[in-house]
Amino acid sequence: MSIYFGPAGNSVSFAAQGYKKNTQIPEYLEQFGLNAFEYQCGRGVKISDASAAEFGAAAAAKNIQISLHAPYFISLSSLEEEKRTASINYILQSARAVKAMGGTRIVVHSGSCSKISRQEALHLASDTMRKALAALDEAGFDDVRVCPETMGKVNQLGTLEEVVELCTIDERMIPCIDFGHLNARTFGGLKTFADFENIFNTIENKLGNSRLKEFHSHFSKIEYTQNGGEKCHLTFDDTVFGPNFEPVAESIYQKSCEPTIICESSGTQAEDAAKMKAIYLAAGV
């Protein structure tokens, strides 16, 4: 059974241990027993093809699976056509970079729905996504898996149901289930095993068992407000906001899933990814 754990970007300890270069990341991850890494391009895809390939070779040597977080500027549901077109270009840039790294998955945000209805926003996002997939095909990136992410703020497009609906567009799309975001936008709604089981069942019922088994995920504890949702990312030391990883680990075992779980803790993402792996292994005992 292949399951992948790793961080989103580097923990504070990466530089503290004297590491400086991207090519040193796989060696750094090895000490934690991790086998995944999500390269961060939230502020734009700025890595060259050559540097991406060099990083990818170092990752492959340590059997690290690479994914990439596409720019935050992406807004598939924007009312401005210019921004929707730019979003397609950002997706193309992300695909090019992750392919150079030897990866296939890119995580994208869907956009906002603060000025229009959620249904109108979903319609715009779906239309933009179809155009993006066509552009990926034309560019020769038809094997890139686009992973729309569940979002933490209430006025963002990205409920579980909206993300799953987006993924019905094409089988190459995989949902990125951010459990911390879902907990934040439901004001602490993920507590019991049944709460998490419902997420897994929703994916399976709408997208089928094969895509459930390979789903992409972000996990962190997140502080939230009672009117807007997500406020800020925390570490696993938090005992107030949650969610806890144990019900996720149990659900993964019960459904025989093989996901990629990326930790987005604030500054301790590698350390907390290792804790998630330990929780997962203990759940299977």
Predicted regions span which residues?
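N-terminal pre-domain/capping segments
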Residues: 1-96
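Hydrophobic faces of well-ordered beta-strands that scaffold small-molecule active sites
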Residues: 3-10, 37-39, 66-70, 106-108, ...
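Active-site beta-loop-alpha junctions enriched in small/polar residues
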Residues: 8-12, 40-44, 71-75, 111-113, ...
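Distinct, well-ordered alpha-helical segments
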Residues: 16-26, 48-56, 118-137, 153-171, ...
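Acidic (Asp/Glu)-rich catalytic clusters
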Residues: 25-33, 47-67, 93-102, 133-141, ...
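Active-site acidic/histidine proton-transfer and metal-coordination neighborhood
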Residues: 60, 77-177
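Acidic/histidine-rich catalytic cores of soluble enzymes
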Residues: 132-229
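C-terminal helical cap(s) of enzyme catalytic domains, especially alpha/beta-barrels
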Residues: 270-285
